[in-house]
C-alpha cells in the first residue's frame, strides 16, 4: 500500500466527507493527508496527517500538486486542481462522488469557465446544493471502488 495515498483539499471539504475518509484510512491502513491553510481536528492515527500551508490563493492546491504522485487519489471540488493532478497520473474525486478522469476533465473545465464567464457578466448562477445523504453515499461508494482496486 506504500504507493497509494489520499490527499484532501481540506479547506472546502465537508466534514461528513472527512469522517468517511478517516474511517477508510484506518480500515485500510492507508495514508491520508489533509492540506489546509488552517489547523484541523483530525483523529490521532498513524495513517492520518495534516499539512498546514500559508494563507493565499491556491496555496493548498499547489502543495498538493507538488507532492501528488501516480496512483494517489485527491479529494477536491476544485476542477482546475483536479486537472493538474490528473496530468500527474493521480485520480481526483469530488465530495459528491464524481470521479474526474482524463476522459471528462476537459469538459468539466470548459463548463466551469463558461459558468465563471456568466457570473462575471452579472448572471446569477447560484451555488451548489447542500451535500445530501445521497451525495455522501455516492462518495462512499466511489471511494470504496478505488480502495478495492488498491488492495
From Swiss-Prot:
It holds the Pfam family DUF188. Signal peptide: none annotated. InterPro entries: UPF0178 (IPR003791). Disulfide bonds: none annotated. Belongs to the UPF0178 family. This is UPF0178 protein SO_2894. It comes from Shewanella oneidensis (strain ATCC 700550 / JCM 31522 / CIP 106686 / LMG 19005 / NCIMB 14063 / MR-1).
